[in-house]
Amino acid sequence: MRPSKRAADEMRAVSFERGVMRHAEGSCLVKFGDTHVLVSATLEERLPPWLKGQGRGWVTAEYSMLPRATHDRTRRESTTGKQSGRTQEIQRLIGRSLRSVTDLVALGEKQITLDCDVLQADGGTRTAAITGAWIALYDCLSWMRQRSMVKEIPLKDHVAAVSCGIYNGTPVLDLDYAEDSVAETDANFVMTGTGGIVEIQGTAEKTPFSQDELLGLLSLARSGVEKLVGLQKLAVG
């Protein structure tokens, strides 16, 4: 039995609230159960120096967590003078995931930055951030199209992410913190709406997992991403 009493293939309640930030070109408050992430999309005319003159744009991301997003207060990274390795890893993952479904040539020589701020953490913050960031990116690109900055929304597909793991010997979908903190195996899957795999991050916390177990988790993740993409489609109409 899972602590949340969910079925093994049951996700937490997922919701998207669009347009929650007045000044951002796109924004979304995404909730995976008690994990809440606020994502804002900012359009900028500047590009990284190494991209200038190449006729294409860039999509990048930043990730942070409010001090009391967690059970015990987490010190702000700005007070330490540097980002943790975890933060850098997550924001690079978010950026890679969004770029995988964005037509950067059609975007033109512009940069869109997705700021992902965790308001409350209960496991799966990176997967929620990726899934909500797609909504914020879509709204930013829609804003651009309305102003004739792009002819069409330069998105090639949806992208969403979900965690899977082995908890008490059972493969389960969308781990919350109570499961994630003691799971034998924990993995994150980033996939497109058409089923393409963008990234898999998997770790055996106790004993190594088998190829069959990995394929089982992949199947579970695919069903979860299909549900998330369906909710994204409903959210953007």
UniProtKB/Swiss-Prot annotation:
A GO biological-process term: rRNA processing
Alphabetical UniProt keywords: Nucleotidyltransferase, RNA-binding, rRNA processing, Transferase, tRNA processing, tRNA-binding
InterPro entries documented for this protein: ExoRNase_PH_dom1 (IPR001247), ExoRNase_PH_dom2 (IPR015847), ExoRNase_PH_dom2_sf (IPR036345), PNPase/RNase_PH_dom_sf (IPR027408), Ribosomal_Su5_D2-typ_SF (IPR020568), RNase_PH (IPR050080), RNase_PH_bac-type (IPR002381), RNase_PH_CS (IPR018336)
Residues where phosphate binds: 86, 124-126
Annotated catalysed reactions: tRNA(n+1) + phosphate = tRNA(n) + a ribonucleoside 5'-diphosphate
TM region(s), chain numbering: none
Assembly: Homohexameric ring arranged as a trimer of dimers.
The name this protein goes by in its record: Ribonuclease PH
Lineage: Bacteria, Pseudomonadati, Pseudomonadota, Alphaproteobacteria, Hyphomicrobiales
